From Swiss-Prot:
It comes from Agrobacterium fabrum (strain C58 / ATCC 33970). One of its GO terms (biological process) is thiamine diphosphate biosynthetic process. This is Thiazole synthase. GO terms for cellular component: cytoplasm. Pfam families: ThiG.
């Protein structure tokens, strides 16, 4: 079980709800993934007006924990306002905090992120901050009151997979007791296995599933991959060696002269 802000969930896969071919495909992908947590962009869905209402009804029928996000916000003020609106709509203190600083890379504005995190934590929100793999920023977010960190492994939607394993390893080692969820950049189930083998607690996916040729099949593949990576981490995988090591014991081997 994974505990996030005192709430236990059985799945280590968090799933985004945007860009699926149809509501039916989204619903089937959610079920195939076995996820307990769905992320939702309040701004995007409210912009759809009538369709947004139909979407929210579908989400309610799926009966998962809702993690609203502040996608599309570029300032701390925008993010805080969106978070407050999401709290009213979804009746939850959970918020996935995104403050985007660059239009091309969608890299977080870490200065505004920390500012918004401090405000929201002080107002009783349970903040899931989308951040970089920078350890100093991570420290500042924890000092602001965050009890979960969500570092990227590559730019949002890039599907490149983990670009800086050293940084991800360092973050895991530096914060052994903090739930760490890789958010952004995952493209394949093998990428998810890689980060889970490092000891990360969960993976958040959206584009990798929604944009796949078969989103439902991909959701199931990721669910299996994340579980496999977590089990591998718990089982203690071998560390790489510079030299060959025989797998067959030498003792008892016949010697011919």
């Amino acid at each position: 079980m994974l505990t996030l802000y005192g709430r236990e969930v059985s799945s280590r896969l968090l799933l985004g709800t945007a860009r699926y071919p149809s509501p039916a495909v989204l619903a089937d992908a959610v079920r195939a993934s076995n996820t307990d947590i769905l992320t939702i962009s309040l701004r995007r869905e409210m912009a759809g007006a009538k369709k947004g209402g139909q979407f929210f009804e579908l989400i309610r029928e799926l009966d998962r924990h809702i993690l609203p996000n502040t996608a599309g916000c570029h300032t701390a003020k925008e993010a805080v306002l969106t978070a407050k609106m999401a709290r009213e709509v979804f009746r939850t203190d959970w918020i996935k905090l995104e403050v985007i600083g660059h239009h091309d890379t969608l890299q977080p504005d870490v200065f505004a992120l920390v500012e918004a995190a401090k405000i929201l934590c002080d107002e009783g929100f349970e903040v899931f901050p989308y951040t970089t793999d920078d350890l100093v920023v991570a420290e500042k977010l924890l000092e602001a009151g965050c009890r979960v960190l969500m570092p990227w492994c590559a730019p949002i939607g890039s599907a490149m997979g983990p670009l800086n394993l050293t940084a991800l390893k360092s973050m895991r080692a530096r914060f052994p007791e903090v739930p760490l969820i890789v958010d952004a950049g995952i493209g394949r189930p093998s990428h998810a296995v890689t980060v889970m083998e490092l000891g990360y607690d969960a993976v958040l996916l959206n584009t990798a599933v929604a944009g796949a040729g078969d989103p439902v099949g991909m959701a199931e593949a990721f669910a299996r991959a994340i579980e496999a990576g977590h089990q591998a981490y718990l089982s203690g995988p071998l560390e790489p060696r510079d030299m060959a090591v025989p797998s067959t014991p030498v003792i008892g081997t016949a010697v011919f002269s």
